[in-house]
Amino acid sequence: QPPQEPHLPEVCEEIENIDKPVIAALHGTALGGGLEIALASNYRIAEEKTKLGLPEVNLGLLPGAGGTQRLPRLAGISAALQIMTSGKPISASEALKLGVVDKISTNLLEDAKAFAKQVAEKNSHPKTSMLTEKFDNDELNKEAIASMKELIQQKFGALEAPKKILECVEASISMDISEGLKYERNSFSELMAGKQSKALIHAFFAERKSAKIPEVSRANARDIKTLSVIGGGTMGAGITIAALNAGLKVKMIEQDNENLNKGIQHVTKVLERDVDKGR
């Protein structure tokens, strides 16, 4: 569905430009746009069991409401790239260490009120987009960018979203905030219009719909004791090893005895090596 007004990037900018301090009180899961709203706030307080993350990469997208520009200013280049390219959430305690949240709470509402009173007495309040401390070490940031660029190439190959995230984070260093936000938005639109995001979004919803099929949800899983693997090459041997380690009997099928023996020898060699290592 096309986005409806007010658009989230504009909401985040409005929050950041309010002349009174804004404290985001987080609990449960603060993911995607929810976390981007919190990043646009002046302060963040989180319940101790809160999970925080920007999982858009799993849909072939990037955080499009300031996440690629604000998170590096709080957590630093390396940590921000790790969070956004992995799509995995972090704990509240990890977020506190990184500087993503300012305080952890066991009684969120009361602690948030007390925190609000405390910061209200200050004359100035930090705008996330204006923070530059994490950008001071040019050499360290260049190393982080270069290292992540190599890792993204090795790990993600032809996937576009991780590369675009890296480009946006580079923009957060080299551009002012308004230019960086514009660059992020254009990059988001490019990914949204691309084939990869459409395919990953389709897969995301298809997986959830499949779990709701009555015949599937009511069915009892069959007890599997034997597995047949077609092919004894690298992939077939790997599947065979995993199945044997799980206690299953395996029948390996190959086109001739020569290839079958090679496959069996490969599996045997790996298992013997694991035994020698005490695995």
Predicted regions and their residues:
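An acidic, glycine-rich surface segment that forms the CoA-thioester-binding/catalytic face
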Residues: 1-27, 67-69, 74, 200-222
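Crotonase-fold acyl-CoA enzyme core
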Residues: 14-131
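Amphipathic alpha-helical segments at domain termini/boundaries
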Residues: 36-39, 84-187, 201-220
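Conserved acidic E/D residue at the C-terminus of a beta-strand in Rossmann-like folds
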Residues: 56, 251-257, 261-262
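Conserved N-terminal Rossmann-fold NAD(P)-binding element of oxidoreductases
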Residues: 229-231
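N-terminal Rossmann-fold NAD(P) dinucleotide-binding loop
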Residues: 236-237
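Gly/Ala-rich phosphate-binding loop of Rossmann-like dinucleotide-binding domains
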Residues: 240, 244
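Conserved N-terminal Rossmann-fold NAD(P) cofactor-binding segment
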Residues: 257-279
